[in-house]
Curated annotation (Swiss-Prot):
Gene name of this polypeptide: pcm
PANTHER family listed in its UniProt record: PROTEIN-L-ISOASPARTATE O-METHYLTRANSFERASE, PROTEIN-L-ISOASPARTATE(D-ASPARTATE) O-METHYLTRANSFERASE
EC number: 2.1.1.77
One GO term (biological process): methylation
Xref: InterPro entries: PCMT, SAM-dependent_MTases_sf
Highest taxon of source: Archaea
Similarity comment: Belongs to the methyltransferase superfamily. L-isoaspartyl/D-aspartyl protein methyltransferase family.
Role of this protein: Catalyzes the methyl esterification of L-isoaspartyl residues in peptides and proteins that result from spontaneous decomposition of normal L-aspartyl and L-asparaginyl residues. It plays a role in the repair and/or degradation of damaged proteins.
Protein known as: Protein-L-isoaspartate O-methyltransferase
HAMAP family registered for this protein in UniProt: PIMT (MF_00090)
Reaction catalyzed: [protein]-L-isoaspartate + S-adenosyl-L-methionine = [protein]-L-isoaspartate alpha-methyl ester + S-adenosyl-L-homocysteine
SUPFAM superfamilies in UniProt: S-adenosyl-L-methionine-dependent methyltransferases (SSF53335)
Enzyme's top EC category: transferase
GO cellular component: a single term: cytoplasm
Length: 205
């Protein structure tokens, strides 16, 4: 089922690299969804978790992962851990060589994600924190890439500060006509923003 889904994403031009393709084929999405949704794990759609959160649709995970151009040795910050699936895909995309710090504001979700990631062997590559992701994780900055999995009203200044010069942030932003996914590249004290597509995420809390 995973193979068929990934082939569809490849045909649609969403999966572009072997790294992301391999990551999506390796990470068992059914291990990151609630038991009642396991049969739907390889449908290309978001699925409910709890506390109003969702696990993102596979095409969105693939798109965001491709946008950061993953490579071994990267230090990545994820804001909005959810069930841990997105972090696991990123870990595989960097060949588990590097570090992913992921922060979740809902304590129950942070615990759920940590359990999933530890059970599946990602401990040591992925570190889960409970806290306000808008503030980032200053003690581990700067980051090569930042992925935000909830829609912000504005790009949080703390996240821009914690992005390495030349680093990439992928973030959905609430705008007048809807949410827009941006690829943000830091250039010295400035940022370059590129609109990618319209999206629908839960709000960044």
């Amino acid at each position: 089922m995973a193979k068929r889904l990934v082939e569809e994403l490849e045909r649609d031009g969403i999966v572009k690299s072997e790294r992301v393709k391999r990551a999506l084929l390796t990470v068992p999405r059914e291990e990151f969804v609630l038991p009642e949704y396991r049969m739907m794990a390889y449908e290309d759609r978001p699925l409910p978790l709890f506390a109003g959160a969702t696990i993102s649709a596979p095409h969105m995970v693939a798109m965001m992962c491709e946008l950061i151009e993953p490579r071994p040795g990267m230090k990545i910050l994820e804001v909005g851990t959810g069930s841990g699936y997105h972090a696991a895909v990123c870990a595989e995309a960097i060949e588990k060589k590097g570090r992913i710090y992921t922060i979740e504001i809902v304590k129950e979700l942070a615990v759920f994600a940590a359990q999933n990631l530890e059970r599946l062997g990602y401990w040591g590559v992925v570190e889960v924190y409970h806290g306000d992701g808008k503030k980032g994780l200053e003690k581990h900055a700067p980051f090569d890439a930042i992925i935000v999995t909830a829609a912000a009203d504005v790009i949080p200044p703390a996240l821009i500060r914690q992005l390495k010069d030349g680093g990439v942030m992928v973030i959905p932003v609430e705008e007048r006509l809807g949410q827009v996914l941006y690829k943000v590249v830091k250039r010295g004290d400035k940022i370059e923003k590129k609109a990618i597509t319209y999206v629908m995420f839960v709000p960044l809390r």
